[in-house]
Amino acid sequence: MLTVTPPPTLSVILLNWNGRAYLEQCLYALAGQSQPASRVMLVDNGSTDGSVEFVREHFPWVKIRDNGGNIGFAAGNNVALREDDAEITVLLNPDVILYPDCLAALSEALAEDPRIGIAGCRLLYPGGDIIQHAGGFLTHPQAMPGHYGIGERDERQHNMPRDVEYVIGAAMAIRRSLLDEIGLLDEGFFLYFEDTDICRRARRAGYRVVYWPAAMGIHIESATAIKGSFAYLQRFHSSRWRYLLKHFPAEEIAGPTLEAEAKWLDRLNPAERRAVTLAYLATQRGLPEIWVARERDGGDPLPPEAQAAVDQGMTGLIARARSAEFDPSGLERLAEAGVLREQPFISNIPLVGAIIAGFRSAWNNVASRWYVNHLMTQQNNFNRMTVAQLEQYEAELRGQMELLEEQVVLTVELRRRVEKLQAHVTELRRQMNHRQG
């Protein structure tokens, strides 16, 4: 008698933050899968758009976990991952609509080879004919991400499975045994690069990360943050620097990375530069914890001198970013223009021009020079005092801007701590209600 091996158990974690507009299509697509998930959990990060109420009313088969606050992508998913016991877990964004065979294809991918720890999808832009993601890669020395196939018309040119550096967390399948070995998502990433990080850790542990083209979906990619916005740039580059400091070799960070970053920084517009400055400040403030995370997740420890070099390099980048906010030659030009100088008399009349100019000069010496020179001296003194005062105001403004930037970083850090505390309180209340019930 032929024995049929059942497919591995598979669950879906759907992390949501104010994604109500996308949930209906996303959940209907999950309900229509050829291989349904054994469990679908909506993890809500404190939405205020009625997401939880909508799902509870219209999709009662979805298990709901309300975190009570926006604790980020990694921490939010980890809440569900700690409870999950399925052999395969699919992390999914609300703005992704899976094709009917997507979960079956992801299950097939991990069944193909026990060394495959993570599998990702072929994701298309709305319309279904343009590729958004067919596996990812990072450029060196700055850890800028790229996507295979992005912007290409899907003509099955990326139709073969392949090992890649990373797949994006909008729709990725993770083997449970991998998480048991390397740990959960790094909660130091609030948003962005947490998927790249866990793929790097998986490959370091000897697992494969694969792009699996049979697993397909539409990624609307607009539910979380507007690309190019100040908040996006700040979060993206904070996470980018956390990633490269966790995983890049010390000699690359201290040399090519800092050098390339400085040149890249000079090309940014003022708004982008301000956002990146905050990312640098947050990174520098978090360096002690990042070095701990680097060793915890299997990276080579950085010796103290290398850590000091990175710290010094970050200070240099911050200073470079801030200096570009002011035109250093502006006050110099103003000071030069503010000096009044006596102009000689000139006449362009042929033959007698020099005589006329000499007469005017002589008359000026007798009639008005004594008075005009006095006024010029007064005006020059006033102009010098004005420029000096402006220099003082500029220095004070620079100082206030630096304090404001540091306060913004501290405020963001404090807000995240408060959100995590709210999530802990919500979880304690849930446990108390469960025991009392």
Q: Where do the model's predicted regions map?
A:
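Short, acidic, metal-binding catalytic loop of nucleotide-sugar glycosyltransferases
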Residues: 28-37
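Short beta-strand/loop segment that forms part of the nucleotide-sugar
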Residues: 38-46, 65-67
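Conserved donor nucleotide-binding strand/loop of the catalytic core
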Residues: 52-83
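Acidic/His-rich active-site region of diverse nucleotide-sugar glycosyltransferases
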Residues: 69, 75, 79-82, 97-98, ...
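Short active-site alpha-helical segment characteristic of glycosyltransferases
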Residues: 195-201, 217
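Terminal low-complexity segments of carbohydrate-biosynthetic enzymes
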Residues: 238-239, 260-347, 351, 386-389, ...
